[in-house]
Curated annotation (Swiss-Prot):
Region (Ligase): 284-558
Family indicated by similarity: In the C-terminal section; belongs to the NAD synthetase family.
Residues that hold L-glutamine according to the record: 123, 190, 196
Primary role: Catalyzes the ATP-dependent amidation of deamido-NAD to form NAD. Uses L-glutamine as a nitrogen source.
Residues at which deamido-NAD(+) binds: 387, 416, 526
Pathway noted in the entry: Cofactor biosynthesis; NAD(+) biosynthesis; NAD(+) from deamido-NAD(+) (L-Gln route): step 1/1
GO cellular component terms, A-Z: cytoplasm
PROSITE patterns: CN_HYDROLASE
Keyword NAD: yes
Entries under InterPro entries matching the protein: C-N_Hydrolase (IPR003010), C-N_Hydrolase_sf (IPR036526), Gln-dep_NAD_synthase (IPR014445), NAD/GMP_synthase (IPR022310), NAD_synthase (IPR003694), Rossmann-like_a/b/a_fold (IPR014729)
Record-listed ATP binding positions: 304-311, 411
Stated name of the protein: Glutamine-dependent NAD(+) synthetase
Amino acid sequence: MFTIALAQLNPTIGAIAENAEKIVTAALQAQARGADLLLTPELALCGYPPKDLLLNPSFVEQLEEELQWLAEKMPPSIAILVGTVTPHHQAERQGQKKLWNSAVLIEQGQIKQWFHKCLLPTYDVFDEDRYFASAAKSEYFIYKNVKIGVTICEDLWNDEAFWGQKFYQVNPLMDLIDQGVNLVVNLSASPYSCGKHYLRESLISHSAKRFNVPLIYVNQVGGNDDLIFDGGSFAVNSQGKIIGRSPLFQEDLALLSYDLSSGELTGQKLASLPMVDTEELWQALVLGVGDYLHKCGFSKAILGLSGGIDSSLVAAIAVEALGKENVLGILMPSPYSSDHSIQDALALAKNLGMNTQTIPIGPIMATYDQALVPLFQDAPFGLAEENLQSRIRGNLLMAIANKFGHLLLSTGNKSELAVGYCTLYGDMNGGLAAIADVPKTQVFELCRWLNREQTIIPPSVLTKPPSAELKPGQVDTDSLPPYDVLDGILGRLVEKHQSPQEIINAGFEREVVLKICQLVQKSEFKRRQAAPGLKVTDRAFGSGWRMPIAQAFHPQGS
């Protein structure tokens, strides 16, 4: 019997020396707990995804140097399989990819073997074919007379029996089975979307049972730009039963035992999963906000508090991620702000224990109005004047953030961002859009969940009609359909890629569907200039959304 440790790590992209130290620490801890073999996530040495850092030769050189340092620092009694980038030295032909996405085996202070990723994803947020060469097949190493097959992330996602179709021509897992492996490990950096860990476990359990081989899956954890990695590393036996699992959204070192006589895995820990999707989503957003600030060098956040539900939720997330003393809320009431909204904002801040400052914007609005009289003359009050209020607020928030070194959190939700119900250089200002991938209906669900044990979000915030309060008596439904209808349409259009006619056939009014489709298309220029938003659904308006701005395509049925 030998013991395998799964190091579920939270690397910082480009912090190569720091990441190497983290791996050494994990190895020493694993050795102290009796482990013989340590597994890290995909590209653990540089962090995933490194993107165009890979085009910098010095980045790759530093990775090579740190890999050698890592080998020298490894305890001699433990072997390690570490995810990193390695040069493709045979890539001499001009234009051929010169890098591998690799797993490197280190034993007794020596680099013994290299394993390269076969399947390179190019969908959604992935663009690996831009940088890496694709290996012809997966390979194995022998450890204590056990053939251990090595795969990297996507290599396990081509089980045609599970999906009902093949996505790639080769199946690395099947290649390893044909080579007679006894155990398969997978080094992964699989980004989070709500409920995705269930899909991973279902897929890998199915594959283990299909091929009668135990499988180990070790995932990255932490936030890197718009992506959140949820961890949840796990192992299954040859019958497809999960026998060990690390917790979601935190670093972990889990141990497994491999029985040489039975050829089976046994686990020492089976972490429970969140009871509801809302709890899981909350944990993801908290991790994403905290890591984004810390990895960008910020310790404090600022946001505008309007008394509405979106800013209330973002404030609660920020306080949980950073601590109440590190979050500042700014109230900026205008002549159109209701008294109850001001009181709701103050009540929220009191419930969270965070500090606030109030800056009435009426005098600034008057100055703008006076300056624009020669141009606007007698034109009636309209959208330009409404947006000026938002831009005044955005300007004030950026000034305060700039003055004190805080990061400004944008508070817009996915529903608003989709249809452009937001103001460029106004409420869209910020360094991070915390809930930009959370639909409005889910914002309400999160706030109700937060209030399950004690009142954090003031009850009136949950019951009053949503409003931007940029003119007298304004409510969101003056411009948009009810949010349950809007989110139903957007979910089908954005995440399920349905055509307007398919959405209409699902029971939505034709006129409403066509209006929403048009708004989504016309608002691309706003999304292109938005702050980075944390991805929590299968399709976000982030790095995986690549729509043109100047375009005239209209789907059939529209």
